[in-house]
Amino acid sequence: MASISLSRQPALSTAELEQITSVWKAPGLFATLISVFCAFGGWTLLLPVIPLTVIQHGGSESLAGLSTGVFMGATVLTQAFTPWLIRVVGYPAVMAGAGIMLGLPALVYLVDMSPPVLLGIAVLRGMGFGAVTVAESALIAELVPRRLMGNSSAALGTAVGVAQLISFPLGLWLLNSHGQAWVFSVAAIYAVVGSAAAWWIPYQSKARKADQDALLADATAARSADNLEVSAAPIPAATWKLAAVPGLAIGAIATGFAAFSTFLAPAVEAIDLTVAALISAAGLSVLGGMQMLGRIIAGRYTMKRGEAGHLAGIGLGCGITGLILAGILIALAPVGIPLVAGAFAAAGIFGLGFGLVQNEALLMLFERLPNEKTTLASALWNMTFDSGTGIGAILLGIAASAFAFQQAFWIAACIGTFALCVVIADRVVGRRRLRGTAKPAPAAG
């Protein structure tokens, strides 16, 4: 492996980028991974803690779900204009500022966690999360040649997975052992470190922008030079058509993630308090670890096949299975070791599918959209992901309040089943893609 340095390096031109033989030689990738690790570490740290704290302080399941939903709503709205923001101020400023917004406002919860403050801080943190998620997903395509994108996406998945593997149990352990002050302080530390690392991410070089402008000019001239070829060429499909299937897949699996992250902890507390802390902490850690494995598998498989999407259906199937098992487990309400084993199994199976679908959907969007729409592809992936998480948390919270926790998991499984049917249909009858800019798919390098 090439030596890794955090020293600031200029971005590479297109020609220089194509000479890279390893993702670890890409300037700025390691700094990006550190920033991503801290962003997702801080987010994951508080993800199960805030809903659980709301319920422990007398709030309803609906309010707990609403806090997640408002966070994700702000996230999605921010993601819509993040590509523009990146063009204006660059990746380093976006990543650094977003990291601060994601972590530091949570310190206000030490003073006040009333509903207005709870939801107001959720909006601020959601804005930070929205910007950082779009930027980091786009960077894995910007910093490496397209043939190595499977490896860079696997590296990104590893950073996210390790962050979740550590932070899921850490947040709940800190809450139970030391109280809220420790949890929110650690989230603030994550924010500061991640923001500092972001300043070592290179700006896109002028040479790179000139290369892209030249390619666009050449393509325009070529189309103008031969009207017959233009007439015979396929009309590019609308962006929403190209993005619909991967967007539905990630949105559906994210709804299932909302069920696990928001309602697993209170559900097991209602069944057996003696093992609730273990399941709440380690169960989500198992989910994060298997998610990391799924993203690595999907990235490597795409590198070998040269095309993304082959494992999307399998991933959704695993996610559906995990949700159904979790619902059955909560309905049967076993205690002790059976409850622990069942929760770990359900979380692990879901996590594997979650990771597979995450990676497949992102690479499918990068493949289907033109090169100049890399940040748009990243924004669409993140918007559908976080819409699924946010809307899922709200709707499943209503279901949990009106019926029972298991209903939330089963409803999420039904949504996943619909997405699976669409993905299968897409693989069978949707092989031919109409795209505006031809480009090679990721291939083994």
Question: How should these model regions be labeled?
Answer:
Residues 78-90, 294-307:
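Helix-to-loop junctions at the C-terminal end of transmembrane segments
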Residues 7-26, 205-246, 442-445:
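Juxtamembrane intracellular "pre-TM" segments in multi-pass secondary transporters
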Residues 123-160:
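Cytoplasmic helix-loop-helix junction between adjacent transmembrane helices
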Residues 88-98, 303-317:
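Cytoplasmic membrane-interface "Motif A"-like loop-to-helix N-cap segments
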Residues 23-65, 257-268:
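Helix-loop boundary and gating motifs at the non-cytosolic
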Residues 72-80, 164-165, 288-296, 390:
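Residue-level signature of mid-helix packing/kink "hotspots" within the transmembrane helices
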Residues 309-358:
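C-terminal transmembrane helical hairpin of 12-TM major facilitator-type secondary transporters
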Residues 184-199, 409-425:
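Symmetry-related core transmembrane helices of the 12-TM Major Facilitator Superfamily/SLC fold
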